[in-house]
C-alpha cells in the first residue's frame, strides 16, 4: 500500500501537534503561570513566565452577538512557546464552561486550524456542537445560527464538516485542565 505525499504530511503534522501540546506539569516546569481575567462578556488568559513582564501567550474570547448556541469566540490568540497554544485553548474551554468555545468566525491560522481539527477528530473528552449558518441551512432554529466565513474559507464545499463550523466544550462538564493547573499553583486571578 502506498501513501500519498499529502497524506503522509498530514499524518506527520497531526503527530507533531499531539507531541507538541504542553501539559500543565510541563508548563509549571518552565515557570509559566496563567493569569485569568473573566468578565460577563469576555475572558482573557495570559501565560507569563516568572520574572518576565512580557506574556508568553495570550488568549481571549467573548460572545459574538450572534446566537451561535451561546458559544464564545476566540478573538485573539498568541503563543510564544511551542505547545502552549493547545494548553491555553483547553484552559479557555474550562474557564468559560458550560458555554462552548469556537474559532474566530472570520480568520483562522493554519496552526489554529490544526488545533480545532484535533478537537473534532481526536478528543473524546470534548463535545462538538454543530453550528448552523445565518440562513438556516442545517436547522430551522435561530439559536444555532452563526457566521461561518472561516469554515467556508478553509473547507470549501464542505463547511458543515469543518472543525471551524463547530463549537467545543467538555463532555459531561468538569474542568480538568483548570483543576490541574490550580492544584499545581499555576492559576492567578486578576
Predicted regions and their residues:
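Terminal substrate-recognition subdomain of acyl/acetyltransferases
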Residues: 21-28, 33-68, 98-190
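Extended, structured, electrostatic nucleic-acid-contact surfaces
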Residues: 70-80
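Hydrophobic, well-ordered secondary-structure scaffolds
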Residues: 73-75, 91-95, 104-106
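Short, charged/polar micro-motifs that form catalytic or ligand-binding hotspots
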Residues: 78-83, 102-106
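Conserved acetyl-CoA-binding loop-helix of GNAT-fold acetyltransferases
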Residues: 79-95
Amino acid at each position: 500500500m502506498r501513501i500519498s505525499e499529502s497524506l503522509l504530511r498530514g499524518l506527520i503534522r497531526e503527530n507533531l501537534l499531539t507531541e507538541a501540546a504542553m501539559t500543565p506539569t510541563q508548563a509549571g516546569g518552565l515557570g509559566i503561570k496563567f493569569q485569568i481575567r473573566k468578565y460577563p462578556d469576555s475572558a482573557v488568559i495570559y501565560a507569563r513566565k516568572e520574572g518576565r513582564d512580557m506574556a508568553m501567550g495570550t488568549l481571549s474570547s467573548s460572545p459574538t452577538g450572534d446566537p451561535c448556541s451561546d458559544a464564545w469566540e476566540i478573538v485573539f490568540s498568541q503563543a510564544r512557546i511551542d505547545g502552549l497554544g493547545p494548553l491555553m485553548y483547553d484552559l479557555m474551554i474550562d474557564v468559560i464552561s458550560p458555554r462552548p468555545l469556537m474559532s474566530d468566525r472570520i480568520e483562522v491560522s493554519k496552526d489554529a486550524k490544526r488545533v480545532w481539527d484535533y478537537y473534532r477528530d481526536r478528543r473524546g473528552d470534548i463535545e462538538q456542537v454543530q453550528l448552523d449558518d445565518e440562513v438556516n441551512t442545517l436547522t430551522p432554529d435561530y439559536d444555532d445560527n452563526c457566521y461561518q466565513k472561516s469554515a467556508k474559507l478553509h473547507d470549501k464545499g464542505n463547511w458543515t464538516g469543518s472543525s471551524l463550523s463547530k463549537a467545543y466544550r467538555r463532555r459531561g462538564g468538569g474542568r480538568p485542565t483548570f483543576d490541574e493547573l490550580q492544584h499545581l499553583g499555576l492559576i492567578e486571578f486578576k
